[in-house]
Structures are given as C-alpha cells and as structure tokens.
Design a protein with these regions (language model features):
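Bacterial N-terminal signal peptides that target proteins for export
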Residues: 1-8
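Hydrophobic h-region of N-terminal signal peptides that target proteins for export
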Residues: 10-20
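ER/secretory pathway lumenal C-terminal domains and tails of membrane proteins involved
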Residues: 18-401, 405-407, 415, 419-422, ...
Length: 458
C-alpha cells in the first residue's frame, strides 16, 4: 500500500533535499500549486497498490517545492537513467509523465529568466480560447504551458498535448486516462494506420529517387531509407516526426467542435498537409480545418504588428521593409555585445536561452510565409509573402543572432530569391558572431561556390 508510509517516507527523504534548498527562493504561488498538484496526482495514482514509486521521485517533488531547481534537474536525470530510459522496470505512465512535467519545467526555470517564461505563457494564453486543443512542440512550448495552466487535468484554460510524443503508445495511454473522454484521441489502430500511411509514402519517394536519379530528390533530409533483403528499413527521427504530424491531423479531425493551436517543434515541411491551414496567432499558430487561400489580410497585418511590438519591447528595434541588410547585420553585431543606447530589455539580452526561444518562434512564422511564396496565386500575393518572410527572417535573426535555425532560414530564403550576393554578405556577418559554428562554415562554402558558378555562367 502506498499511503501514509509513503508520505512519511517522502517527507523524510525530502528533508535531506530541503536542508540543501533552505536558501533557495520559494516558488511563486501558481508554480507551487502546480508542483503540489502533480505530486498529489502521483500519490493518488499509486496509493492503492499501484506501481512502485522510487524514492528519488519524492525527493524531486520536495526539491521543486523548495525552489531548488538544480537538485530537481539532477534528480530528473537520475530518474531518467535509472528508472525510465532503458530500465528493466520502467516507471508507470501516471508517474513518469508527471515527473517529466515538473522536472522539465523546473529545468527551464533553472536556465531561463522566469520573467520571459511568464511572458511566453501570457502570450499563448491570450490567443488560445478556452476549451481549445494546444499542441506544444518544444520543451518551453510544452512544459511552460502545462505548468502555468490553471489545471492541465481539467483542460483549464485549454487541453495541452505534446506533439512529439503522440506516436508513443505509453504517452497515448497516459493522456487517454488524463483527459477522460474530454478530448477524443487516436487509439492504437489509428497509430498503426498512420505508420502504414507514412511507410507507403516513404517507399514511393524512395523508389522515385532510385528510378529517376537526375530529378530532385523526394526522400527527406535526415530520412535514411534502405532496402535490406527486400525489406525497406527506415532510421532516424524523420519517421517519428511525420507520424506525429499525421496523428495531430487525426486529433483535429476527431474533435471538430474544438479549435486547435500548435507551437512548432521541428521545422515542418514534412507536414505538408498542415501548412495551408496554419494561421499566425501571437507567438504560435492556429490550425484551421480548411486551407486558407490566401492568408487573410488582417491576419498578416496583425502578425506584423504583433512582432513589431514584441521586438521593440525585447531588443529595442523595429525592422522595416526598407531597412538595409547591412544595417540588420550591424544591429546584430551590437545586440551580441554591449549595445550602445540599448532601448530594449537588458535581461533579455543577457539570456541566450530565452533569446533562442523567441527567435525560434519568429523563425517558424518565416517558414510559413516562405512556403507560401512559391504557392502564391498572384504576383501581388507573392510580393506580400516575400515581404513578410524577409521581415520575419530578419526579426528572428536579431532576436538571437547565434540561433543557427534563424541563420539557415534566412539564407535559404535569400537563395530561393536568387539573391546570392546578399546571402554572401549575410553569412559573412553571421560567421563573425559565431566563428566556430561548423554548419555556418559549410553554408559560407556552399554560397561561395554558388557565387563562383554564377560569375562563370553570366
């Protein structure tokens, strides 16, 4: 029985952590409430002879209640290594995912300024209506929203799902129990169907590349497909990314009465079905059920104004369409050091993790606009999408010049627009701020080769 003895054990073990955490700042009331709720849920789920709870779990909850974020992070690593990843006796879902929620959030607090953690949450809560379904992609997008919601279990203010774990049958079991039919979710049959849909498509793309080697490759970057003894084998992260995307699609279809929102995890070109239905909404996207052709003028205008306000607040800059590329690069140089006459938030400038988070959010928007450039139905729509894509690329870069995703996204945009000279200027400036980054060195070499080719074929 996991009842009073367990609680006494937890208190005893917790005292060991509490002694070390005595000087730690106590969590804010809403954070303390979240930690207590998750701890109580583990206790209630296991008190009547359920799965055993390792003592490190109670230690972790106690450390979290004391605001000892470093100890929480260390204990989560121990729990993951000893009782979850590759362990013979893995933690039960009702324990593991609650441990992960608390440990993941506390880890973010330990490495990010809490002010900006709250800013992200506030911006998401502003745009997602009550009762909606929200797919968190990155660790911040998942753990922050889970922790700062009024109640994850009751879907208050909305229902949060981890998009990157939908393919995991253990996670699906957990959220089925968690939401108790409030949200309709895929069953194992639907997961199997998504897997079969992906493998059939992967086989078709692989066979195309084998039969037509001179045509553009259809196999995705990072998708390792091989034929072994007549059987197709696929390795890498891509299958999981694509299948998770198909399960997001299924959840949207299963819940026609609920609005859906998504925070991008990986860049999503492999979720081709989703792009036409994504609409910028604050720092994330609304996922509509029908494609938007084209994006509403009001949506584009609101997105531009939103990020102009936010970049002014965070980095003290407003980028305009007519801002010269050299000026953007010079501003990035200033924002990477001690900026003169800085008009933004100095705390933001000093927090590289937070800068990367907001840069990634804006870069995701640039990806949507770039995708629409090549699919525009008119020259005026194309010009508008080019304009919005470049603005978003520049803002993402200035928010965090050392974010390789923002650098790569802007370079790919410039190359797609046949602006090789600008791409060369940009990567030269970016490398000055990140001289040891091998990916950026590779980009510089590639763009130099493109430039040489253009000169030789004029």
């Amino acid at each position: 029985m996991n009842s009073l003895p367990t609680m006494i054990l937890a208190a005893t073990l917790g005292a060991l952590v509490g002694a070390r955490a005595a000087e730690a700042a106590q969590p804010d009331a809403d954070i303390a409430r979240f930690i207590t709720a998750k701890s109580n849920q583990v206790y209630l789920a296991t008190r009547d002879g359920g799965a055993p709870v390792p003592p490190e779990v109670w230690k972790m909850f106690t450390a979290a209640s004391s605001g000892d974020w470093k100890s929480v992070t260390n204990l989560l690593q121990d729990i993951t290594a000893n009782d979850h990843s590759g362990a013979m006796h893995r933690l039960a879902p009702e324990i593991w995912f609650r441990v992960q929620d608390v440990g993941g959030f506390c880890g973010l607090i330990s490495s990010n300024n809490l002010k900006f953690i709250r800013l992200f949450a506030e911006e998401v809560f502003k745009v997602v209506p009550p009762g909606s379904i929200y797919f968190g992609g990155s660790d911040p997008g998942r753990f922050i929203i889970t922790a700062l919601s009024r109640s994850q279990e009751e879907g208050q203010p909305f229902f949060t799902l981890a998009q990157s774990q939908l393919v995991d049958s253990v996670y699906l079991t957990y959220i089925h129990r968690l939401y108790r039919q409030q949200v309709k979710l895929p069953d194992q049959t639907m997961v199997n169907e998504a897997y079969q849909e992906y493998t059939a498509d992967a086989r078709q793309r692989f066979e195309h590349d084998q039969q037509f080697p001179d045509e553009p490759k259809q196999v995705f970057s990072g998708e390792d497909i091989r034929m072994v003894n007549g059987q197709m084998q696929i390795t890498g992260q891509v299958p999981f990314i694509v299948i998770n995307g198909l399960l997001v699609r299924d959840i949207v279809r299963l819940n026609p009465e609920r609005e859906c929102y998504i925070e991008e995890n990986f860049p999503l070109p492999k979720w081709e079905w989703m792009y036409p239905s994504l609409e910028p909404a604050g720092p994330i996207f609304k996922l509509r059920r029908t494609p938007l052709e084209p994006l509403y003028e009001e949506t584009v205008r609101n997105d531009r104004e939103y990020w102009q306000r936010l970049t002014r607040r965070l980095i003290g800059l407003v980028v305009h369409d007519e801002t010269d590329l050299a000026e953007v690069c010079a501003s990035a140089q200033e924002l990477s050091g001690k900026s003169k006459d800085f008009q933004g938030d100095p705390d933001f400038l000093q927090d590289e993790n937070v800068r990367r988070t907001f840069s990634r959010l804006r870069s995701a928007g640039a990806g949507i606009y770039t995708w629409r450039v090549s699919r525009a139905k008119s020259s005026s729509e194309r010009r508008q999408m080019v304009r919005e894509a470049e603005l978003a690329c520049r803002q993402a870069y200035l928010l965090c010049p050392k974010n390789p995703e923002a650098v790569a996204r802007y370079l790919m945009f410039l190359i797609s627009e046949h602006r090789i000279e600008d791409a060369q200027k940009f990567i030269t400036a970016a490398l000055k701020l990140n001289p040891d980054d091998q990916t950026e060195k590779d980009w510089a070499r590639y763009i130099r080769q493109m430039s040489d080719w253009e000169k030789n074929h004029r």
